Amino acid sequence: MDRYQALFAKLAEKNQGAFVPFVTIGDPNPELSYEIMDTLVKAGADALELGIPFSDPLADGPTIQGANIRALNSKTTPIVCFDLIAKIRAKYPETPIGLLVYANLVFANGIDTFYTKCQQAGVDSVLIADVPTNESEEFRTSAIKHNVHPIFIAPPSASDETLETVAKLGGGYTYLLSRAGVTGAETKAGMPVAQLLARLNQFDAPPAILGFGISEPAQVEEAIKAGAAGAISGSATVKIIEQHQDNPAALLDALTAFTSAMKAATQK
């Protein structure tokens, strides 16, 4: 059983959904970034979704773009990122770790090299934001070869054909978009998702985790009630880092409070 399967099985026993925060590795700097990831898991995050800083994050709104800029300014390279992931993996052997990246980063040193590094660092899944299913074969083949789940996005407007492909090609979990557009807590998640979940389930897709615009416990509760296996919160998590970047103690306290509240909302 891989880490995602083990997590979903454990949560099912407890009658809970998964809470998965997203942060950009190296934001605001590599040292504090490690503390942030450690704090998120300690405060109750079921899995981590991590970004490798990139100069042109197309799918992201201003909050996560800011995180990328801070991380790049503090000299966070992919090598630094993989080192930090390996450190978190060593401390938390069972916590699933997913990466959310852009294709250019994967191409930079060769696709196989990228997935080899993922495997060595203990990464469980990779979602490439700008690679749709019909262009994914090369990435997917390499991911599977290195025991990394390829994650695909199920958009709210998807046809049955798209959902079937996402279900067939994906592993680990399915990233369910609550609405179209770029990421951001400023724009509320556009529920309801029950209908989309029902369609995904008929194609036997990996468990669906809802993302985009999830910033408060009530939305997590709603997502779980609608049948999602969990909720991902990116911009709201990153906003806390942005607000407290100059005061590490306040930052870690605020992240602990936020994560605990979001996790509590996953109880069915």
From Swiss-Prot:
SUPFAM superfamilies registered for this protein in UniProt: Ribulose-phoshate binding barrel
Keyword DNA repair set for record: no
Pathway: Amino-acid biosynthesis; L-tryptophan biosynthesis; L-tryptophan from chorismate: step 5/5
Domain of life: Bacteria
PROSITE patterns in alphabetical order: TRP_SYNTHASE_ALPHA (PS00167)
Gene Ontology molecular-function annotations: tryptophan synthase activity
Cystine pairs: none
Catalytic center residues: 49, 60
Catalytic activity line of the entry: (1S,2R)-1-C-(indol-3-yl)glycerol 3-phosphate + L-serine = D-glyceraldehyde 3-phosphate + L-tryptophan + H2O
Alphabetic keyword roster: Amino-acid biosynthesis, Aromatic amino acid biosynthesis, Lyase, Tryptophan biosynthesis
GO terms under cellular component: cytosol
EC number(s) per entry: 4.2.1.20
First-tier enzyme category under EC: lyase
CDD domains: Tryptophan_synthase_alpha
Quaternary data: Tetramer of two alpha and two beta chains.
Function: The alpha subunit is responsible for the aldol cleavage of indoleglycerol phosphate to indole and glyceraldehyde 3-phosphate.
PANTHER family the UniProt entry points to: TRYPTOPHAN SYNTHASE ALPHA CHAIN, CHLOROPLASTIC, TRYPTOPHAN SYNTHASE, ALPHA CHAIN
Similarity-based family: Belongs to the TrpA family.
Protein name: Tryptophan synthase alpha chain
Lineage: Bacteria, Pseudomonadati, Pseudomonadota, Gammaproteobacteria, Vibrionales
